Amino acid sequence: MSVISMKQLLEAGVHFGHQTRRWNPKMAPYIFTERNGIYIIDLQKTVKKIDEAYNFIREVSEQGKDILFVGTKKQAQEAIAEESVRAGMHFVNNRWLGGMLTNFNTIKTRIAKLNGLKKMEEDGTFDVLPKKEVIILRNEEEKLVKNLGGIVNMTQSNIGALFVVDPRKEKNAISEAKILGIPVVAIVDTNCDPDEVDYVIPGNDDAIRAVRLITSKIADAIIEGRQGEQLAE
């Protein structure tokens, strides 16, 4: 029994690919047909690939490993944040800072700075500082939250997989994962290179509903895996 139905995928518009002139020939095996200058993705293959990705993510989660969600394009930002939080995971949805995985010690100093600013706000330090200084500190905090808010509790060594929306846009995240041997699961549209991804989910990465639907399935897999881990304890 599949974790997702063709009907759900159709309703969310997962089958709509890019214009035929903007395609990667390596995606040919996942294309069903062409309609009005747009490639239509073969949803039977998408169902199969979602099942494979779901099982893999569930296993990673069962082992107690974490999954990092990455999606910085506008259509993905909300789903990436909300679904990763629902699954108790980490996310990057604003900007991938170089070294987020490969130079995590430097990133950790920025996270410590963010935590320090939060503490200053909570313990009333901001109330006794000059107004100008507080404005500067608040702006810095806001910027840090945008870029690092989703990974404040992340331990780099415990990341077991990356879930990515649009591997073309998130190529830096994928190359860092590759260096560290971290498997990548991704929503791959008709203009992307599937060879960059370990678990390809062929689908529309530009429609909010399509991204939300697939991202929610990844979150479900994590939750199911964690429950299995709890049952095993």
Curated annotation (Swiss-Prot):
Full protein name: Small ribosomal subunit protein uS2
- Would you tell me the Gene Ontology cellular component terms? cytosolic small ribosomal subunit
Q: Which GO terms describe its biological process?
A: translation
| Molecular function terms, GO-annotated | structural constituent of ribosome
Keywords attached to this Swiss-Prot or TrEMBL record, sorted alphabetically, are: Ribonucleoprotein, Ribosomal protein
Classification of source organism: Bacteria, Bacillati, Bacillota, Clostridia, Eubacteriales
Task: Indicate whether Ribonucleoprotein appears among the record's keywords.
Answer: yes
Q: Which PANTHER family match?
A: 30S RIBOSOMAL PROTEIN S2 PROKARYOTIC AND ORGANELLAR, SMALL RIBOSOMAL SUBUNIT PROTEIN US2M
Q: Can you tell me which family this protein belongs to?
A: Belongs to the universal ribosomal protein uS2 family.
